[in-house]
Amino acid sequence: MLQKPRGTRDFLPDEMERRRLIERRMRDAARRWGYREVCTPDFEHLELFTMKSGEGIIQEMYVFEDKGGRKMTLRPEVTAAVLRMYVNEGKVLPKPLRWCYFADCFRYERPQKGRYRQFWQFGVELIGADTASADAEVIMLADDTLRSTGVTFDLHVGHLAPMKHLLSGLDPGDQRAIMAYLDKHDQKGLEAVLFGKNLTHLAEPLAALGECRTVSEVFEVAGDVPERARIEETFTLLESQEIDYRPDFGIARGLDYYTGMVFEGFAKNLGAENQILGGGTYRLAHLFGGDDVASCGFAIGFDRVMVSIGDFELAHEPVVGVVCTPEGRARALEVARAFREAGVRAEADLMQRGMGAQVSHAAKTADFAAVLGKREVEAGTVTLKNLHSGEQQERSLEEAIAEVARHGAC
C-alpha cells in the first residue's frame, strides 16, 4: 500500500476546518491593517534563493531540472519570491506596498514535531517605507495576528545595530560567523570562534547585550549607535500601544539581508522547537535587479501555531440529511437545493438505501432528517426529525428551513 511521502501530512475534514478557521483569522487581521494578499509560484528558479542565502541552502531544498535544462526548486520560503514579484511587476505601484500571503513551502530536513518537509507560512511584507513607524506597524501587526489565533506567546523585539556596532571593524566574514553562532545560541561555537580570532574581549559585551532589558541599557553597552534615535522611536511607539513584548538585543537573525529591527515570537506551551514567528527589516530587491528599497516583514509558522493551539471545538453548522422513497428522489433533490440556497448544509442519499437505512446513516452524519414519504411528496411538505432529541413534526418546506436555520452555528 502506498504511503504519503515522509515529512508530509494528510488532513481529514475536521482538521482542515480548524486550519481554515485559523488561516482566516490571520488573513482578517492583515486585512484590517490594509494588507492585500498576493500569490507566487510554488516553484522558482534555483538562483532566486542561492543569491539570497548562498549555495549551502541547496542541500535543504527540493531541487530539480526541468525539461529545458533549467535548475528549479520548490520554494523553501516566500519572502524572496515576493520581492522578485515586486521587482518584476510591482515597482510602479504606489508605495508603501502592504502585501500578505499564505503559502506552503518545502524543505528537505529531518521531520519532527511541528517541523515538516511541506509546511505552511503566513507572512507580511511592507515594501517601500523606511521609518520607525513602518517597523512598529509590522511588529504590531505580527502581535495582532498571533493574538487572533488564540495562541499564547512571548514576543521578543531587538535591533541589529548595537550588535553590529560592537562588531564593526571586523572582517565581514568574521561578523557573519559570530552572528550565526549568536543566532543559534551556540555558546561553545561562539567561544571557539572568538578564541580562534583573538576576539575574546568581545565575549563580555556580547553577553551583556543579550541581557539588556531596556533601550538605555543597550547603549550603555554598545556605545553611541547611529541608529539610536530610530530604535528609541520604534520602542516608544510599541509602548504607546501597550504591546506586550520583551526587548531582546541578543537576537542575531542569521539571514544576511536583515538590516535593522528584528523580532521573534515563541509559543509558551511548546518545547525546544517553540519559535512561531520571525521577522525584521531588510533590503533584498536589489539582488534581483530592482532598486535598493527598504522592506519589513515577518513569517508565522502556521503548523507550529496549530500544534500550540491543539484540538478545539469548532462552531457546528447543522446538517440536514434528506430521506426519501425511490419515487421521491426528484423531490428530494428539490428539497436539498432549497436548504442549500438558504445557506444550510444538506445531503441527499446517493446509495439507493431504504428509508430506514437512510435515517440510520443520517443519524451518523447529520443533525436533522428531512423525511419525504409518499404523503409528504403529495402534500408538498417534509417531516423534520431532530436526530439528537428524536422530536419530529410535519412542516412546510419553508418552516423546516427556518427551524434548522434557527439552530444556526453553535
From Swiss-Prot:
Entry's localization field: Cytoplasm
Keywords attached to this entry: Aminoacyl-tRNA synthetase, ATP-binding, Cytoplasm, Ligase, Nucleotide-binding, Protein biosynthesis
EC number: 6.1.1.21
Coiled-coil stretches noted in the UniProt entry, renumbered to this chain: none
Main localization of the protein described in the UniProt heading: cytoplasm
Main EC class the enzyme belongs to: ligase
UniProt keyword Protein biosynthesis present: yes
Protein name per the record: Histidine--tRNA ligase
Domain of life according to the entry: Archaea
Endpoints of the signal sequence: none
Reactions the enzyme catalyzes: tRNA(His) + L-histidine + ATP = L-histidyl-tRNA(His) + AMP + diphosphate + H(+)
Organism of origin: Methanoculleus marisnigri (strain ATCC 35101 / DSM 1498 / JR1)
GO CC annotations on file: cytoplasm
